[in-house]
Curated annotation (Swiss-Prot):
Residues 64-133 form the S1 motif domain. InterPro entries: Exosome_RNA_bind1/RRP40/RRP4, KH_dom, KH_dom_type_1, KH_dom_type_1_sf, NA-bd_OB-fold, Rrp4, RRP4_S1, S1_domain. Belongs to the RRP4 family. NCBIfam families: PRK04163.1-1. It is found in: Cytoplasm. Residues 141-199 form the KH domain. It comes from Thermoplasma volcanium (strain ATCC 51530 / DSM 4299 / JCM 9571 / NBRC 15438 / GSS1). HAMAP family: Exosome_Rrp4. Its main location: cytoplasm. This is Exosome complex component Rrp4. The keyword RNA-binding applies.
Length: 236
C-alpha cells in the first residue's frame, strides 16, 4: 500500500528494468535482450506501459498549484494520487465536494480516474495533500491526456492565457492545464488531434520567439487542409 512519503522506485542509467507491458520512454534493450534504464529517474509502471521519467522532467509540488493527478490507490478514507512528482500526493475524503462514508470511496473515484485538484499543503520533504473543494476542481471525465515538461506549462498557457485560448478556439476543444505538466483535452477527435499537435509544437519550440504566430498559422493550415479536402470532394 502506498502511504504519504512513499517514493517511486528510483533507477540509475544502466539499471535493469523488469518489463511486463509495452515500453515507452527511458528504457532500452541491451545486447543480452534485457531491458535497462536510460535515465536517472523514477520507474513508472501501469497495466499497459513501463516508463522511466527523468528527474529533470518531474514536477516539484508547491502549495496553491492546480494539478492533474491520477488515482493509483483507494484506501478507507484517502486516495493516493500520482501528480508526476517523485512523491505521491494524498486526497482525503473530507477534501472533496461529496458526502462520503468511510470505505465507500470507490463509488466516487477509483484507480485510473483523473482529478483536477489544488495542492493545499506541502511539507519540508515535499509530501502534499490535495483538495477538490474549490470551484472548477473536479473529477475529469473522458478526454485525452497529454504530458509535457512542467517548465513548459507557462508557455502553453501564454500571456494572459492567450496561447491556450487560441488553441481552444481554433480546435473547438476544452483544455485544462495542470501546473505539473498534465493536460486534459476534450472535444471532437479532429480538434483533439490538432490541439495535441499544437501543444507538442509549443513544448518543442518553447525557447523560440514568434511562437504564437507560428502556432496560429499551423492550426489554420491544418483546418484549411481539412476544409480544402472536403471542398475537393464536394466538387467531384
Amino acid at each position: 500500500m502506498y502511504q504519504l512519503g512513499d517514493v517511486k522506485k528510483i533507477v540509475l542509467p544502466g539499471d535493469p528494468v523488469e518489463v511486463q507491458g509495452k515500453i515507452r520512454n527511458g528504457i532500452y534493450r541491451g545486447p543480452d535482450n534485457k531491458y535497462y534504464s536510460e535515465y536517472f529517474g523514477t520507474l513508472q509502471v501501469s497495466d499497459q506501459y513501463v516508463d522511466v521519467v527523468p528527474f529533470s522532467g518531474q514536477y516539484i509540488p508547491r502549495k496553491g498549484d492546480k494539478v492533474i493527478g491520477k488515482i493509483i490507490e483507494v484506501g478507507p478514507s484517502t486516495w493516493t494520487v500520482d501528480i508526476n512528482s517523485p512523491y505521491f500526493a494524498m486526497l482525503h475524503m473530507n477534501d472533496t465536494p461529496w458526502r462520503i462514508s468511510s470505505g465507500d470511496l470507490k463509488r466516487y473515484l477509483n484507480s485510473g480516474d483523473y482529478v483536477y485538484a489544488k495542492i493545499m499543503s506541502v511539507n519540508e520533504i515535499k509530501e502534499s495533500w490535495l483538495t477538490l473543494k474549490e470551484p472548477g476542481l473536479k473529477k475529469l471525465e473522458g478526454g485525452h491526456m497529454v504530458l509535457i515538461h512542467a517548465s513548459r506549462v507557462p508557455r502553453v498557457i501564454g500571456k494572459g492565457g492567450g496561447m491556450v485560448n487560441m488553441v481552444k478556439e481554433l480546435t473547438s476543444t476544452r483544455i485544462i492545464i495542470g501546473q505539473n505538466g498534465l493536460i486534459w483535452i476534450d472535444g471532437p477527435i479532429e480538434g483533439v488531434t490538432m490541439a495535441i499537435a499544437a501543444i507538442e509544437m509549443i513544448e518543442r519550440e518553447a525557447h523560440t520567439e514568434g511562437l504564437t504566430v507560428r502556432v496560429e498559422s499551423f492550426l489554420k493550415e491544418l483546418r484549411g487542409d481539412k476544409d480544402g479536402n472536403q471542398q475537393d470532394k464536394a466538387n467531384q
